[in-house]
Every structure is written in C-alpha cells, then in structure tokens.
C-alpha cells in the first residue's frame, strides 16, 4: 500500500482589507492599511512552496485569511498556480462575494469557513452561498459572531437557530 504524503498546513494572511466594519473587530484587523500584495508575486511564492514541499514528499494545504480574502484581485492567479492537482485548501471568508465569484473560485477549495457577522451579513445571500458550496461537495463551516449588544446577540441566536434547523 502506497503511503500518503504528509500534509503541511500553511495559513496565508493576505492583509487587512475588508468590506465589513464590525463593531467588535479590532480596527487593525480591518483598517485597509495592509493592502494586498502583487498577485503574481504571491502566486510565484505559492508555486515555489508547492513544488518545494512536493519534492520532500509533503503535500501543502493552504488556508487563506486576512481581512476579506475574496476581495484580493490576485487570488485567481494565486489559486491557478498551486499545482496541477487539487489541494486541500481552506478559505476563511465573510461569504459576501457574489455568486459569480463563488462559481469561478470554488474549485480551488475543499473547505470554506464562513464568518457570519450579524451587523452586515445578508442571510439570504449567505444561504445561497452555503447551498451552492454543499452542492459542490465542499466542507462548509459557519461561525456566527455574537457581541455584547443585545440586538446583535439576539440576531446571532436567531441566525444560529435558522442554520441549525437547516442542518448546516
């Protein structure tokens, strides 16, 4: 029996560019001060990392985070340079990207973690994204963020119950 390669997990923080301004999130995590690096530069680094690890019989597994990674204009280039076989990549996102975005990019990920932020998230859109990703056989994890503000707390509990009832 052939031995499976060892997995190296790599968390890639793109910056702090985000389309949300959540009250509970520290400003330095979404201030848009750390802009996205050049997509080709990162794509080259990703390609080098993939090649180097595979020469060591190791398989890379990337997790893309940072602000809101779906806003990174270089993400497609980065994903396309990961190698010719599907990697076990994870995307941590607020889920706000358009359905067109998801239709183009989902193939580069095996897992998507959606942070549901009650102050900004559109539940109907998030449900469409979740259903689409599940239909495409991706693992989907949902984090519903709560705050000390009563209105947001109640909304978070309500959204959690909706997601739980739908067995997400």
Please report, for each region that a protein language model flagged, where it lies by residue.
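Phosphate/oxyanion-binding active-site loops and adjacent basic polyanion-contact surfaces
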Residues: 38-42, 71, 122
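Short, well-ordered coil loops that connect the C-terminus of an alpha-helix to the N-terminus
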Residues: 20, 84-85, 165
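Active-site beta-strand/loop signature of hydrolases that rely on acidic residues for catalysis
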Residues: 66-67
């Amino acid at each position: 029996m052939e031995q499976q390669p060892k997995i190296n997990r790599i968390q890639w923080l793109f910056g702090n560019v985000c389309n949300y301004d959540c009250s509970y999130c520290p400003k330095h995590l979404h201030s848009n001060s750390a802009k996205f690096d050049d997509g080709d530069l990162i794509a080259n680094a990703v390609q080098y990392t993939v090649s180097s690890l595979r020469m060591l019989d190791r398989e890379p597994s990337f997790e893309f985070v940072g602000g809101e990674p779906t806003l990174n204009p270089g993400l497609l280039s980065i994903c396309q340079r990961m190698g010719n076989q599907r990697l076990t990549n994870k995307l941590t996102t607020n889920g706000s990207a358009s359905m067109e975005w998801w239709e183009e990019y989902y193939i580069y990920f095996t897992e998507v973690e959606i942070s549901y932020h009650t102050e900004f998230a559109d539940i109907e859109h998030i449900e469409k994204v979740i259903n689409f990703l599940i239909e495409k056989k991706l693992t989907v994890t949902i984090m519903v963020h709560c705050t000390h503000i009563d209105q947001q707390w109640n909304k978070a509990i309500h959204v959690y119950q909706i997601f739980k009832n739908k067995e997400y």
